[in-house]
Amino acid sequence: RVSGLAAQVWNFEPLYRTPFVKIGDWQFAFSETTIIYQMWEGLYWDIRFSIGEDGETFMTRFGKPFEHYIQEITCAAAKNAEEKYSVLFQNEFPYMYKGESKASSDCYFRIGNVLIAVEAKAKSPHSDTLTGVSREAINTEVNELMVDPVIQVLTRLNEINSDDNNIPEETLKFFFGVEQTIILSVSMEKVQPIGELLFDFDAQVKQHLSHTNVVCYHNISVEDYEVVCNLIENCPDELPTILTSWYKDQRVDKRSAVVLVNYLSSYGKQYV
């Protein structure tokens, strides 16, 4: 019986779809997370299904406001950071590279000599990924939400740091003197950071990281990123260390699954 239960695929999706349990006249919620998830994801799908277009068209249109939201909260956090800390913000910008039109990552911010590059993806894992039923589905979304954004950021940085672009000197100054780079891929919902998946992720991006100063990279949900923005405002000097330490703790072994809310608690920070 025990071995049978261990091998069983557990699908917790119904708890996200219907986070309340009703007993008589009382309604109970077992998790604040499932309520917040339903408010955000539920609203998204209500809007999605109210539009009689194909999913690709909707996602293309939804992507821009999602990116803009990430840019806005990052800019606001950088401006509101404690005055004694220098937090600089750089929004997305167009440029020409070897005669081709390009666009930078969605936004960047700097804390001292540490550059944090942010790439927003208006996507979330599908049901097959959330339930762990299909390894093929999981691998596809590891690529879309984790691997591809990291490679995209690295490609843009290589172009920005080359001599073959027409980027104004004033914009280029933002990237001068960077000693460490952190990459954040922000999606509607993240692929859960389980050690085994992270090791596969690392193997796929390893060759692209050679001769770079990238110290860590994460795929995080928009909710996680809002917490990151709060850290930018209140303790920006600690944020690079928090992100790099969290990166290492997630990779202790293949069973590691260190989510941000738990890690911040152990670090003495609130998930707000």
Q: Over which residues does each language-model region extend?
A:
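Extended hydrophobic secondary-structure segments that form protein cores and membrane-embedded regions
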Residues: 89-92, 180-188
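Interfaces and regulatory segments of ATP-dependent nucleotide/adenylate/phosphodiester-chemistry enzymes
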Residues: 1-79, 199-272
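Active-site beta-strand-loop-beta-strand hairpin of nuclease catalytic cores
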Residues: 109-127
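Catalytic cores of nucleic-acid endonucleases
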Residues: 122-181
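Extended, charge-rich low-complexity regions and/or helical-solenoid scaffolds
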Residues: 173-174, 182, 193-202
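A short acidic/basic microdomain associated with nuclease active sites
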Residues: 77-102, 107
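Short conserved micro-motifs at the rims of enzyme active sites and ligand-binding pockets
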Residues: 32, 42, 119-120, 129-131, ...
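Catalytic or ion-translocation cores adjacent to nucleophile or general acid/base/metal-coordination motifs
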Residues: 66-69, 94-98, 124-148, 198, ...
